[in-house]
Curated annotation (Swiss-Prot):
<keyword id="KW-0560">Oxidoreductase</keyword>
<feature type="site" description="Lowers pKa of active site Tyr">
    <location>
        <position position="81"/>
    </location>
</feature>
<dbReference type="InterPro" id="IPR023210">
    <property type="entry name" value="NADP_OxRdtase_dom"/>
</dbReference>
<comment type="function">
    <text>Reduces D-xylose into xylitol. Has a preference for NADPH, but can also utilize NADH as cosubstrate.</text>
</comment>
<comment type="pathway">
    <text>Carbohydrate metabolism; D-xylose degradation.</text>
</comment>
<feature type="binding site">
    <location>
        <begin position="169"/>
        <end position="170"/>
    </location>
    <ligand>
        <name>NAD(+)</name>
    </ligand>
</feature>
<protein>
    <recommendedName>
        <fullName>NAD(P)H-dependent D-xylose reductase</fullName>
        <ecNumber>1.1.1.307</ecNumber>
    </recommendedName>
</protein>
<keyword id="KW-0520">NAD</keyword>
<feature type="binding site">
    <location>
        <begin position="218"/>
        <end position="227"/>
    </location>
    <ligand>
        <name>NAD(+)</name>
    </ligand>
</feature>
<feature type="binding site">
    <location>
        <position position="114"/>
    </location>
    <ligand>
        <name>substrate</name>
    </ligand>
</feature>
<keyword id="KW-0859">Xylose metabolism</keyword>
<dbReference type="GO" id="GO:0032866">
    <property type="term" value="F:D-xylose reductase (NADPH) activity"/>
</dbReference>
<comment type="similarity">
    <text>Belongs to the aldo/keto reductase family.</text>
</comment>
<feature type="binding site">
    <location>
        <begin position="274"/>
        <end position="284"/>
    </location>
    <ligand>
        <name>NAD(+)</name>
    </ligand>
</feature>
<dbReference type="Pfam" id="PF00248">
    <property type="entry name" value="Aldo_ket_red"/>
</dbReference>
<dbReference type="InterPro" id="IPR020471">
    <property type="entry name" value="AKR"/>
</dbReference>
<keyword id="KW-0119">Carbohydrate metabolism</keyword>
């Protein structure tokens, strides 16, 4: 999709850029301009979600670039994610239609189940995005919807032409295995938290052997969660200042961010970093201009402590990763 960014061929047959622009926490006031500038900088994959609450603005940025002739729709790869309140098969298309309307497109390139958790349905007109709201104050209310039922609804939307590829996010290996057994269309992508503090080699090996492409979020470790004042992140040394990462970066005359992205890429993993700085956008794209050595990988492997920053156990003791 971009001459300077390698593509990954998904099991669905579609091509996905190996690096994209993450839209989590993009402010509504600036999201449209940031997406537009990222397109000008050569980015073609935009990773969003219903829950991020900024799909209208992301759509504005994409539409502006298309209207100005910078890109065609088919050159842009749009990812969105089905939020927890819409897992019931009768509500899946309702949620997707809202995403399509906000993004101002008639299909998304990739649609993921955001979490393997089903909350009570909340009508769009009542609250959107609902976040953790389940229609009962601050209480979590769950629905008994098996993942495979939600998946079958997504498969129908692929057949309808509203989605090109489908996948999952924040799934452990056992749930992914169960889904692979029952799916007619196999999940094309598994998006997970992935950084040197949480390397998940067994999950990645299993998924890749099954033909499922891995996309990493939070490639810079605690960075995004420090901005949210999360305790675990605040008490964790930043990877940008870690001696191991700094030493490798100095060896190649690269930034720590480039090293972290290249480390993931050499594991066959797509990445979706975000930056507010134009020069960083360009820097991050250069992640494929150098190679880490076996020794570099061995040093980074020593940083793995199984430290997860995005854990639904923190929400309501939801046992996805226990």
């Amino acid at each position: 999709m971009s001459a300077s960014i390698p593509d990954i061929k998904l099991s669905s047959g579609h091509l996905m850029p190996s690096i994209g622009f993450g839209c989590w926490k993009l402010a509504n006031a600036t999201a449209g301009e940031q997406v537009y500038q990222a397109i000008k900088a050569g980015y073609r994959l935009f990773d969003g979600a219903e829950d991020y609450g900024n799909e209208k603005e992301v759509g504005d940025g994409v539409k502006r670039a298309i209207d100005e002739g910078l890109v065609k729709r088919e050159e842009i790869f749009l990812t969105s994610k089905l939020w927890n309140n819409y897992h019931d098969p009768k509500n899946v298309e309702t949620a997707l239609n809202k995403t399509l309307a906000d993004l101002k497109v008639d299909y998304v390139d990739l649609f993921l189940i955001h979490f393997p958790i089903a909350f009570k349905f909340v009508p769009i007109e009542e609250k959107y995005p609902p976040g953790f709201y389940c229609g009962d104050g601050n209480n979590f209310v769950y629905e008994d919807v098996p993942i495979l039922e939600t998946w079958k609804a997504l498969e129908k939307l692929v057949a309808a032409g509203k989605i090109k590829s489908i996948g999952v996010s924040n799934f452990p290996g056992a749930l992914l295995l169960d889904l692979l057994r029952g799916a007619t269309i196999k999940p094309a992508v598994l998006q997970v938290e992935h950084h040197p503090y949480l390397q998940q080699p067994k999950l990645i090996e299993f998924a890749q052997k099954a033909g499922v492409t891995i996309t990493a979020y939070s490639s810079f470790g605690p960075q995004s969660f420090v901005e949210m004042n999360q305790g675990r992140a605040l008490n964790t040394p930043t990877l940008f200042a870690h001696d191991t990462i700094k030493a490798i970066a100095a060896k190649y005359n690269k930034t720590p961010a480039e090293v972290l992205l290249r480390w993931a890429a050499q594991r066959g993993i797509a990445v979706i970093p975000k930056s507010n700085l134009p020069e960083r956008l360009v820097q991050n794209r250069s992640f494929n201009t150098f190679d880490l050595t076996k020794e570099d990988f061995e040093e980074i492997a020593k940083l793995d402590i199984g430290l997860r920053f995005n854990d639904p156990w923190d929400w309501d003791n939801i046992p996805i990763f226990v």
